[in-house]
Amino acid sequence: MSRLVVASIGPASSVQDGGRHGAQRYGLTVSGAMDRLSLAAANTLVGNEPFAASVEIGPFGATFTARDGAVRVAISGAPRNADVAGNPVAMDTSVTLKDGETLTLGFARGGAFTYLAIEGAIKGEMVFGSLAVNARAGLGSPYPRPLQAGDEFSVDAASGAGELRIELPKPISGPIRVVLGPQDDEFDDANKALFLGSEWKISATSDRMGYRLEGPAIKHLHGHNIVSDGTVNGSIQVPGNGSPIALMMDRGTSGGYPKIATVITADVGRLAQTSAGTAFRFRAVSMAEAQDEVRKFAQLIRNLPDRLRSADSVALNIEALSDANVAGYAVSAMDAGTWQVTAEP
């Protein structure tokens, strides 16, 4: 066995996987990765199951050192500078650390969370089928708390497999999509329109439990207390001060504030990766559209292995080029015989 040692790491970093399912009836929240697509991409790069336990790294930097043998890892998620012994490591790629080598990750340059997957996955004692850490509840393994310098993982020795990159689809842009409710009837039409028509920013005081939204105060129709009922990842509740809170992975399993809307499953990761202070909007969609989008999201996760490429091959994102009309320029702007410009971009 090799070891991967945490040499340094910032706050808001912990072991996360696909989450703890089937235990909410006991008051145990799901927890798990804030951005499931990035978790799955990193795991796919090193041959793990998509939602295997990995390191969720918060906005600040981190360094990891291989000991007692080589360790193969991969990174995906919020972009940041990364290198091994001064050699750059691209996002969405795998890399093998030789014994004694250190992977250095800088501050996130957009988004919040980056995922470090380890070939063979992190091992520990399952709690209701998951290693996911919920620091408030003291749940998770092997460290039921945020990671700190000196922590280490016993991992499988690197397989020697060739390094890979993964071609992810162009990120979705535009408003975060929500389904109104389940208590949207606790708000009049004017305040629902205010919620959907306003720009919002995520407060710097947000965490894995909830994202506090900065913007106009939303007024209740009948008061801010309801009989406590169940919550889900992405529930947007409005407390008495009128400032909405989007409930995230470490949320409580029930709550007593009206929920004006619910972020669709396919967009929860997008919201999670929205940096504090970045302006964004919400857009209401139908339940049918939300269900269609989650089916597409599940299909994307299943098909991630089809997006793997050799790390030595040239990365050419045709989807992005097409959207930017760059691919059309490359095809139509030159005469094949003379290599003279024949069309404007």
Where is each model-derived feature located?
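Conserved "landmark" site that anchors the functional core of diverse proteins
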Residues: 1-345
